[in-house]
Structure formats: structure tokens, C-alpha cells
């Protein structure tokens, strides 16, 4: 999977879960500060990513995932 493909899919999930504009979901966007995501939003986002990519994301894998770019890295590592 290409990085842009993962970013586009994460953008789709973020727009649906967080009700943000697609243009605001960039690799540098921070989930809490820039996209106004709270902890429940982040849980829903992870569930959406797990379903979209058919992956499992243990809680410990989420440590350090603070930006959309970090989420792209995590997804790419999971789908290999």
C-alpha cells in the first residue's frame, strides 16, 4: 500500500468520525489540537481504521500517535 493511499483512507475515516473538512486532515495535523478530537473520538477513529484496513491496533501501539502522519506510519506498518 502506498503512503498516499493510506492517507486518503485515514482522511475518509477522520472526516466521518470527527466531522472535519478533508483539507484539514494533513500529515502534520494533530488529532487533539488541530482536529479537536477527544479520547472517545480517537477510539472511534481507531475502530474505523481497524475495520477499513482489517487490522488490529492494540492500545500500546497508539502511544506516540499524535498526528495523522503517525497514524499513516502505523497503518503502513500493520498492513505491511
Positions of predicted regions on the chain:
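Generic structural marker for isolated residues within well-ordered, non-membrane alpha-helices
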Residues: 11, 28, 46
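Residue-level recognition of specific faces of alpha-helices
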Residues: 9, 16, 39-45, 61-64
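Phosphopantetheine-attachment site and its flanking helix in carrier
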Residues: 33-52, 70
Amino acid at each position: 500500500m502506498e503512503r498516499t493511499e493510506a492517507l486518503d483512507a485515514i482522511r475518509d475515516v477522520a472526516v466521518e468520525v470527527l466531522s472535519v473538512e478533508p483539507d484539514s486532515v494533513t500529515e502534520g495535523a494533530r488529532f487533539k489540537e488541530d482536529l479537536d478530537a477527544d479520547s472517545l473520538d480517537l477510539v472511534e477513529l481507531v475502530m474505523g481504521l481497524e475495520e477499513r484496513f482489517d487490522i488490529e491496533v492494540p492500545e500500546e501501539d497508539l502511544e506516540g500517535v499524535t498526528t495523522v502522519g503517525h497514524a499513516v506510519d502505523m497503518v503502513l506498518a500493520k498492513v505491511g
